[in-house]
Amino acid sequence: MGKYNLILSEYLSFIYNSQSAVQIPIYYSSNSELENRCIEFHSKCLENSKNGLSLRKLFVEYNDVIENATLLSILSYSYDKYNAVERKLVKYAKGKPLEADLTVNELDYENNKITSELFPTAEEYTDSLMDPAILTSLSSNLNAVMFWLEKHENDVAEKLKVYKRRLDLFTIVASTINKYGVPRHNAKYRYEYDVMKDKPYYLVTWANSSIEMLMSVFSHDDYLIAKELIVLSYSNRSTLAKLVSSPMSILVALVDINGTFITNEELELEFSNKYVRAIVPDQTFDELNQMLDNMRKAGLVDIPKMIQDWLVDRSIEKFPLMAKIYSWSFHVGFRKQKMLDAALDQLKTEYTENVDDEMYREYTMLIRDEVVKMLEEPVKHDDHLLRDSELAGLLSMSSASNGESRQLKFGRKTIFSTKKNMHVMDDMANERYTPGIIPPVNVDKPIPLGRRDVPGRRTRIIFILPYEYFIAQHAVVEKMLIYAKHTREYAEFYSQSNQLLSYGDVTRFLSNNTMVLYTDVSQWDSSQHNTQPFRKGIIMGLDILANMTNDAKVLQTLNLYKQTQINLMDSYVQIPDGNVIKKIQYGAVASGEKQTKAANSIANLALIKTVLSRISNKHSFATKIIRVDGDDNYAVLQFNTEVTKQMIQDVSNDVRETYARMNAKVKALVSTVGIEIAKRYIAGGKIFFRAGINLLNNEKRGQSTQWDQAAILYSNYIVNRLRGFETDREFILTKIMQMTSVAITGSLRLFPSERVLTTNSTFKVFDSEDFIIEYGTTDDEVYIQRAFMSLSSQKSGIADEIAASSTFKNYVTRLSEQLLFSKNNIVSRGIALTEKAKLNSYAPISLEKRRAQISALLTMLQKPVTFKSSKITINDILRDIKPFFTVSDAHLPIQYQKFMPTLPDNVQYIIQCIGSRTYQIEDDGSKSAISRLISKYSVYKPSIEELYKVISLHENEIQLYLISLGIPKIDADTYVGSKIYSQDKYRILESYVYNLLSINYGCYQLFDFNSPDLEKLIRIPFKGKIPAVTFILHLYAKLEVINYAIKNGSWISLFCNYPKSEMIKLWKKMWNITSLRSPYTNANFFQD
C-alpha cells in the first residue's frame, strides 16, 4: 500500500508511545476466504490486547492477510493522559520566547496583548478576532510538526538543511508557546477565556500560521522569508501582509517581455516572440523605494533586501522569488477586526462637495446606458424570466441567514432559525408573505451585518438583507449576467473563459507604442461618493426600460428592483458594540445584494470609461481593450508614437488627477509590460497567481464536518502548490490523519486507511498521488466503494419531521403548481429534494446527519458490510474498458514555452508537451438543445443529473416532461422528432461524464484535452457508430496517458481493441451511472 499507511503507523507510534498503547490493524478483502481470515485476525488481535499479550506472533501467523488483503483502518488504544504535547514541546523550547511589541498596531485590540488586558472579564471576552475557525487544534498542529521533526532528525545532505531550517523556526514557535503553556481547546475546537486569559490573545492563530509557514520551508530563501514573517506577525497583526505584498503592483512593470503568449482569433494561446521594453519613469522608482522604506520601518530586513537585490537585474528568471514573497505574505493569517471598525472604515472618508460634477454625470449616464443595454432585449420581448421573476427567485432562494432569528412552527415541531428558506415557508403559511413590498432598511429597521475577512486587507462588512431583496433582484441580475457572458469586457463572466484567456488578452496588444493602465478600485466600490451616482444610474436605467414594455408583470419586476435601490439609498446598519447595538447611517455600497458582483462590474466599467474619456482630451490614443474583473479594471492604450518615460509619467499623473477629481481613493498605475490585479498578475509576459490560501486558519466557521475540512485542507494545499507555494506533503497527510480519525471512547480511536480516504466513494478526502485522480478498478477498490455506497445517505429525524409538515409540503406544492402546466414527478420530486437539502444548513439537522454518518462509518471501518449495490459508478465503466487497452512506450517532445512559471515541474512538463486550454469544458448540460428549449419557456433550470435522467427516457415521456414545463406541444414534438435530440443524448452524456471526472478541477483544467499531440498517442479502430462509447474510450485513454506522464515524466501510447459485442453493453451501462458526492468533490466545488 501507499506512503500514507506507513506514515499513519509511524504517527501512531509517535503519539501513543507509552507502554499501554496498542495499534491493531484491520484488514478486509473482496475474496471471501481471505475475508474470513481478516475477521479471525481482527478478533484474535482484540483478544490478545485485552489480555495484554503481544500481537507479534499473530502478525506472523496471519502473514497472508497482511500480504494480500487491504488495510481498512487502524484501531488504537491508549490510556495516556493529555500532557503529551507539553512534554514533547519542552524538548524544542530551547530558544528565547518572542516578546510582542504592544505599540505596532493602530487599534489597541490588534496588539498581541495578554488576553485579560484586552478583555478584563469572561463576559467581555470574544474569540471572534482570533478564532482559527478550523476543526483541528493547535496541539494537533504541534504534534504534526514534532512528528515530522523526529522522523527527519537523521536526514542527510540537502534534506538535513531543510530539517535544520524548520527546526530553527520551530524553536521560535515552541519557545514562545512553552512560556505560556499550550492553550487547550474545547470540544468545538474553540479557545475559551479561562484557557486564554493569561496568554497573548493572538497566540493560537499566530502559532497556526507559523506552523503552516515553517512546514512550507525548503530553500534558504524560504527560511529567510518565513523567519521574518513569523517573528513580525507575532506583534503586527494589522498591516504586515499589506506592507510585504504592496511592491508587487510596481514590480510587474519593471520586467522586459522577451517572448510571450497572446490570445489569437480562435481564443487560443499562441506564442509570440515579441520584445517589449519596460519603460519606467523615475517617479515609479521613488514610489517603490518608499514602499521598501515602509517595510524597513516595520522591522523587515531580509525581504526588502531580496527585492532590492532583484532590482539590479530585474530579470524574469529571478522573478519567481518576488512571486514567492508575494504569496508568502498572505500566510500570516486573516486580519479580523471588530465589526464597528470595519463599518466605520468606509465612513471615515471625508465627504467633499468639491468634486467634478460633470464627471459624475458622465459616470451615472454610463451606468444607466449599460443597464439599459443589458436588459433592453429581454424587456422588449417580455421575457418569461422577467415575468415570473418571483418564482425564479423562490426556486433559487438560498438557505443563508435572513438577519434575524424567528420562532417557526413546522407541524408539531417548533424551531427557531434565521434561515431565509425557512422564513419564506413560515411567512407563506401565516399569510405574511408579501414579495410586492420591499421592507425599508432605514433607521427603524437597520440592516444586520455579516463579515468578510481576508489576509492583508481590512475586514469588510456584508449586508444581510431580508429575502424580499433577493427575490426582487434575482431575475434581473440573471439577465445582466447573461449579457455579461458574451461581452469580453467582463473578464469575470465571459463565456467559459478562464484566467489564461484574460492573460492572452492583455499581452496581445503590448508593444513599444502601447501602455496598460491598471487600477484597483476596491476602495471606490465601498466609498460614499459612489453610492448616490451608482444607485441613481441604475434607477435611471430602470426608468428608461419601464417605457419599453406594457407587460404588467415585467413592469412590476422592474419596479421592485427600482424599489430595492431607492431603499438602499437610505440605509442604516446595526452593529453590536459590547452589549449595545449601535445604529449607524451607512451611506455606502456593501456586498450582500444579489446584484453586488454584476453591478460593481458595470460601475467599474463606467468608471474606467469616464476616466479614459477625460484623458483622451489631453492625449491621443486608441483604446485596444478595456476589462473589468471584480474590484479591478485595466485598459490597453495604443499611441501613435513610441512610448517614452515622460509619456508614462504624464498619463500616470493625469489618470491619478482625474480619479482625484471624483474624490476616488484608488491606486492607479501605468506600465508598458505587466499588470497586477487581485486575481492574477502578469510580469515579463508570464502569468502568475497568488498562492495565498491559508491552511491552518479559516475565515469563518460553517457547518462542515472534520472530514469536509480535511478535504478542503488538501484541496487548498493542491491549489497553493499549483500556484507555487508548496507545503510539506507529509505534514498535510499527518493533518488528514488527525482530522479523519474517529473517537470511539476516550481511549479508543479509529484511523481510516489510505484506501478508505482515496477511493472515490462518499468518503473520499484526497488523492494518493497529487494531481492525479484515480478511479479504482481492482476488486478490493470496487468492493469498498460498494460497501460505502450502502450507507451513503443519512436520515435526519428533524428534517423528516419538517418535510412532513404542512408548512413545508404546501410550500413545495405551491412552487410546483406555479411552475408546472401538468403533472411532472421528476420536477416535483426534484424541487422537494432541493428544498429538503436546503434544510441541511440548519445546525441541528446537520449535526444529526453527522452523528448518523459517524456511527455508520464506525461499523464500516471495523468490518465492511457485504452489500451488493446494483448502482453503477464511473469506476465500473472504466473497469470494463481497462482490459481492452494495450500500452507501449512513446515520445512527445517539449514544444511549448513556459508561461506559468510557478507550476510544479511534472505539471509544467505536460503543458509544454501538449499545450494548455483557455476554456472550461462544458459540464452542466447548459449548451444542449433541451436545456436551451426549457430556458426559453420556463424559469426552471434542471441540473446535469436531471437532464441525464430525462434524456434517456422514452420519447413520449420526454415530450410530457417538456410540455409540463410550459413548452408548446409543437416545439416538444419537433424536438423529439429531430436529429437534435440524438445529438443531445450524446452531448448530455458527455457533459455528465466530464462532470463525474472533475475535468475542470485541479490541474486537469490546465491541459488541452483536444491536443493533436495527445490524440496521436491513442489508437482506437473505429467500429460501429456509437459515438458515446468512442468518446468514453478516448477520454479514458487521454486520462491514462496524462496521469502516467504526471507520475513518470514520460509518455506512453495506448491501443484499444474494443469488441463490437461489448460496445452495446457498455452503452447501456453508461445510462445508469450514479454520481458520488464526497468531501473531496465538495472541496473542489468550494474552490469555485
From Swiss-Prot:
Enzyme's top EC category: transferase
Cofactors demanded by this protein: Mg(2+)
GO cellular component: virion component
Catalytic activity line of the entry: RNA(n) + a ribonucleoside 5'-triphosphate = RNA(n+1) + diphosphate
Keywords tagged on the record: Magnesium, Nucleotide-binding, Nucleotidyltransferase, RNA-binding, RNA-directed RNA polymerase, Transferase, Viral RNA replication, Virion
Role: RNA-directed RNA polymerase that is involved in both transcription and genome replication. Together with VP3 capping enzyme, forms an enzyme complex positioned near the channels situated at each of the five-fold vertices of the core. Following infection, the outermost layer of the virus is lost, leaving a double-layered particle (DLP) made up of the core and VP6 shell. VP1 then catalyzes the transcription of fully conservative plus-strand genomic RNAs that are extruded through the DLP's channels into the cytoplasm where they function as mRNAs for translation of viral proteins.
Similarity-based family: Belongs to the reoviridae RNA-directed RNA polymerase family.
Protein name per Swiss-Prot or TrEMBL: RNA-directed RNA polymerase
Organism: Rotavirus A (isolate RVA/Monkey/South Africa/SA11-H96/1958/G3P5B[2]) (RV-A)
